[in-house]
């Protein structure tokens, strides 16, 4: 029999449904409280009702659940220590957008070898989010795939739409449905307007097609997300300086949007040199001390060990070191959190 469709599909595997996975790894009442209260705290911070600083910090991507839980345990201590000045949320990214090719994240390829055991990856990711939240550490992630959010979104306190997808209509529609506050990164070329446009688009009602928790394709009608915001991540040059922030605030003001934003210390702002996150942090701390109220949050790439490593066949990985973008090590991360907490004192 002749075919005109699926001519380039070489394999189709059955996928666990979000409902089945949620029954296997159940959210508890205490974790629900953590997620709900953190989302509310973030909303209050980004609208100026809470003078604290939101800090999204953690590895570029999660590849080792054991190391991630250890990191979360250390982070919980600092979250408690600085709770009056910082709202610390752990970066737990399971999906990786690639400019061309490369490892696409723990959910897609949990074994790091191209075997693509997605069902196992989804299970590992959901269990890990439960373990992290159980420690009292809320979780943040990037929403990249249009379906994967159904499996983990109930455990996420803050979400991001990345620089490569901020301009995408379907991602803006997805953001309009998400229950958590969502940050939109400026484009890889530094274009801030597309992030502002994304906030506007995601704030209103949409309809889109997607599977529900039971795998049935459905028409989703959304109410819009009132807590979209810009993430300044740099582009061809950094954009964390006061003059760059003023330009972004002008764009937000033009459309009567909330005049608060987040600064990504990594990516274009550190010129892809991970230790320069410390320099960005110094600048942001000074801007806060000098009275800037526009900066409501920051993002830091950090792990147990400094730097990054490549995945090489038959070679053991260094525990607690990133396999994607290089990160700050733990000591530098703790130093940076202390610096930010001290700067936020000026807001009280």
UniProtKB/Swiss-Prot annotation:
Entry GO CC: cytoplasm
GO molecular function, one term: 3-deoxy-7-phosphoheptulonate synthase activity
Keywords of the record: Amino-acid biosynthesis, Aromatic amino acid biosynthesis, Transferase
The keyword Transferase is annotated on this UniProt entry: yes
Annotated catalysed reactions: D-erythrose 4-phosphate + phosphoenolpyruvate + H2O = 7-phospho-2-dehydro-3-deoxy-D-arabino-heptonate + phosphate
Database matches in InterPro entries: Aldolase_TIM, DAHP1/KDSA, DAHP_synth_1
Record bears the keyword Magnesium: no
EC number: 2.5.1.54
GO biological process assignments: amino acid biosynthetic process; aromatic amino acid family biosynthetic process; chorismate biosynthetic process
Transmembrane segments: none
Pathway: Metabolic intermediate biosynthesis; chorismate biosynthesis; chorismate from D-erythrose 4-phosphate and phosphoenolpyruvate: step 1/7
Assigned protein family: Belongs to the class-I DAHP synthase family.
Function: Stereospecific condensation of phosphoenolpyruvate (PEP) and D-erythrose-4-phosphate (E4P) giving rise to 3-deoxy-D-arabino-heptulosonate-7-phosphate (DAHP).
Protein's recorded name: Phospho-2-dehydro-3-deoxyheptonate aldolase, Trp-sensitive
Biological source species: Buchnera aphidicola subsp. Baizongia pistaciae (strain Bp)
Lineage of source species: Bacteria, Pseudomonadati, Pseudomonadota, Gammaproteobacteria, Enterobacterales
């Amino acid at each position: 029999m002749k075919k005109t469709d699926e001519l380039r599909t070489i394999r189709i595997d059955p996928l666990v449904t979000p409902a089945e996975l949620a029954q296997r790894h159940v959210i508890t009442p205490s974790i629900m409280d953590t997620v709900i209260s953190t989302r509310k705290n973030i909303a209050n911070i980004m609208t100026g009702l809470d003078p604290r600083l939101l800090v999204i910090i953690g590895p570029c991507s999660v590849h080792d659940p054991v190391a991630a839980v250890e990191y979360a345990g250390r982070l919980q201590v600092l979250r408690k220590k600085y709770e009056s000045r910082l709202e610390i949320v752990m970066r737990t990214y399971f999906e990786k957008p690639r400019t061309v090719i490369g490892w696409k994240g723990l959910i897609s390829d949990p074994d790091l070898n191209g075997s693509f055991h997605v069902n196992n990856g989804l299970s590992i990711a959901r269990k890990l989010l439960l373990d992290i939240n159980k420690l009292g550490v809320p979780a943040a992630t990037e929403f990249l795939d249009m379906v994967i959010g159904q499996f983990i979104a109930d455990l996420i306190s803050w979400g991001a739409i990345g620089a490569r997808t901020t301009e995408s209509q379907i991602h803006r529609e997805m953001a309009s449905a998400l229950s958590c506050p969502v940050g939109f990164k400026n484009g890889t070329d530094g274009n801030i307007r597309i992030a502002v446009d994304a906030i506007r688009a995601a704030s209103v009602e949409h309809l889109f097609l997607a599977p529900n928790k039971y795998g049935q394709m459905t028409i989703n009608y959304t109410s819009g997300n009132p807590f979209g915001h810009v993430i300044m991540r740099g582009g061809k040059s950094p954009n964390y300086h006061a003059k760059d922030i003023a330009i972004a605030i002008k764009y937000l003001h033009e459309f009567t949007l909330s005049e608060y934003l987040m600064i990504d210390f990594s990516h274009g702002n550190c010129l892809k040199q991970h230790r320069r996150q410390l320099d960005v942090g110094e600048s942001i701390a000074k801007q806060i001390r000098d009275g800037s109220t526009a900066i409501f949050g920051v993002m830091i790439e950090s792990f147990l060990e400094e730097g990054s490593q490549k995945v090489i066949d038959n070679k053991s990985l260094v525990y607690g070191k990133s396999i994607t973008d290089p990160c700050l090590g733990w000591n530098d991360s703790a130093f940076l959190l202390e610096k930010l907490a001290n700067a936020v004192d000026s807001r009280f």
